[in-house]
C-alpha cells in the first residue's frame, strides 16, 4: 500500500491538471490505524532486519514526499489516526478533524518511538511541550482536541464531509490553490468543545513537567506537582498528571529515553533530517529486544505484561541512548529527494 500511495502521489504532483489531493480512510472506522508492525517484527525475528527496515525506508520516503508536495493535500482524519496514519496526514497542508477523530502516537508502549516524522511535527504543531507529552504517554486526543492541540488545521463535522468533497471537486483543474482550498475548508468549519477532562486545560502544568531534561526529571516534576495540587479545585489537573505517570510507567524505558532525546533534537531539524534520524533509530530498535516484546505483549499474546530489557530507567545509560542515534554504515542511510515545502502552518 505504501508503494502504491507513493507512486500515485508522485504522479499527481507531476500532473498539471491535478490541483489538489484528498486523502481519506476506507469506511467510517479509521483514517489509518498504522502499519502492520506484527509483520515487520516477524521479519526481524527471523534475522532479516534488512527486509524489516525496508518497510520503514519506504514509509519514511512517503512521509518526505508528502512534506515536499506543492499540490495541496487534504487529509480527512475521520476515525482512528495512529502511528503511520499520522505520517500520511501531518506533513500535508491541511488536516481535517471530525467529532469521530481519535489520534495517538502509542509507540513507547510498544517498545518503539514516535516515528513517521513525529520528531518534526510533535514539537512544532503542538504548543510548548505538549507534543512531548503525547509522544511519551501515547495519550489519545479526540474530536476538537486535535484542532485545539494544533494537529488539525480545521474541524468539520462528519455529516458535512460529502458536501465538502463536492465543494473541493468543484474547484476544478484551474481553480484550486492553497488559498482556495483553505477558503473552502473554512466554509464548512464549526467550533467544537474541548472536554473538561482534556489535558489541554492544563498546558502550563504539562509544559513545566515535560520540559524536564530527563525522563526521570519528568516523573519527578509530575509527582511534585501532584503533591502540590491537593485541593479539590485542582482535582482535574491532578488526574491528568497521575494518568501521565501511569502511562510513563508502562512504556519501555529505552523507548522513553530515546523519545525524549529524539523530540528535543527534532525541534532543530528539517523534516528530511528528522526522518533520516528516525531511520537510524528504527534500525537499532529492530535489533533490540523491546520492540518485539512490546508487539508480543500488546498485539500478539495480549497479556499486557511486556518484560522490558533493560527494565528500569536507571539501567538505560546516556551512552546506550546516544548509540541509537549514531550514523549507519555507508550505503544504509535513508536517501531522500528534495526539500520539504513551506507549510501554511507551523511545519
What are these regions (language model features)?
Residues 4, 58, 254, 258:
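Charged catalytic carboxylate motif
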Residues 141-144, 159-347:
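C-terminal alpha-helix plus adjacent terminal tail
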Residues 23, 36, 88-89, 145-146, ...:
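Hydrophobic/aromatic residues within transmembrane alpha-helices
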Residues 49-56, 60-77, 81-208:
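Conserved catalytic cores of soluble enzyme domains
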Residues 1-5, 55, 278:
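Hydrophobic alpha-helical membrane-association signature
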Residues 28-32, 82, 306:
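Short, active-site-adjacent cap segments at secondary-structure transitions
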Residues 3-46, 65-76, 98-101:
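A structural preference for short, pocket-lining loop segments at secondary-structure junctions
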Amino acid at each position: 500500500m505504501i508503494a502504491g500511495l507513493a507512486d500515485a502521489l508522485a504522479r499527481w504532483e507531476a500532473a498539471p491538471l491535478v490541483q489538489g489531493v484528498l486523502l481519506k480512510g476506507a469506511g467510517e472506522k479509521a483514517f489509518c490505524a498504522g502499519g502492520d508492525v506484527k509483520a515487520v517484527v516477524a521479519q526481524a525475528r527471523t534475522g532479516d532486519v534488512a527486509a524489516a527496515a525496508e518497510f520503514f525506508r519506504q514509509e519514511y520516503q512517503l512521509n518526505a514526499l508528502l512534506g515536499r508536495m506543492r499540490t495541496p493535500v487534504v487529509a480527512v482524519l475521520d476515525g482512528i489516526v495512529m502511528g503511520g496514519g499520522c505520517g500520511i496526514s501531518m506533513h500535508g497542508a491541511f488536516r481535517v478533524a471530525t467529532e469521530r477523530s481519535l489520534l495517538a502516537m502509542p509507540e513507547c508502549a510498544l517498545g518503539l518511538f514516535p516515528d513517521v516524522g513525529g520528531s518534526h511535527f510533535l514539537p512544532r504543531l503542538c504548543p510548548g511541550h505538549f507534543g512531548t507529552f503525547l509522544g511519551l504517554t501515547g495519550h489519545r486526543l479526540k474530536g476538537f482536541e486535535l484542532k485545539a492541540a494544533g494537529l488539525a488545521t480545521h474541524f468539520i463535522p462528519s455529516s458535512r464531509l460529502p458536501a465538502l468533497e463536492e465543494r473541493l471537486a468543484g474547484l476544478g483543474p484551474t481553480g484550486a490553490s492553497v488559498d482556495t482550498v483553505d477558503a473552502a475548508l473554512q466554509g464548512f468549519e464549526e467550533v467544537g468543545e474541548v472536554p473538561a477532562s482534556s489535558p489541554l486545560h492544563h498546558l502550563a502544568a504539562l509544559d513545566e513537567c515535560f520540559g524536564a531534561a530527563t525522563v526521570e526529571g519528568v516523573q519527578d516534576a509530575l509527582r511534585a506537582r501532584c503533591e502540590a495540587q491537593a485541593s479539590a479545585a485542582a482535582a482535574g489537573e491532578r488526574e491528568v498528571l497521575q494518568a501521565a505517570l501511569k502511562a510513563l510507567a508502562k512504556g519501555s524505558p529505552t523507548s522513553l529515553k530515546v523519545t525524549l532525546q529524539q523530540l528535543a533534537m527534532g525541534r532543530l531539524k528539517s523534516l528530511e533530517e528528522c526522518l533520516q534520524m528516525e531511520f537510524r533509530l528504527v534500525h537499532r530498535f529492530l535489533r533490540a529486544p523491546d520492540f518485539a516484546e512490546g508487539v508480543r505483549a500488546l498485539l500478539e499474546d495480549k497479556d499486557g505484561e511486556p518484560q522490558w530489557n533493560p527494565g528500569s530507567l536507571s539501567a538505560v545509560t546516556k551512552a546506550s541512548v546516544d548509540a541509537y542515534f549514531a550514523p549507519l554504515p555507508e550505503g544504509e542511510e535513508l536517501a531522500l529527494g528534495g526539500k520539504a515545502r513551506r507549510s501554511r502552518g507551523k511545519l
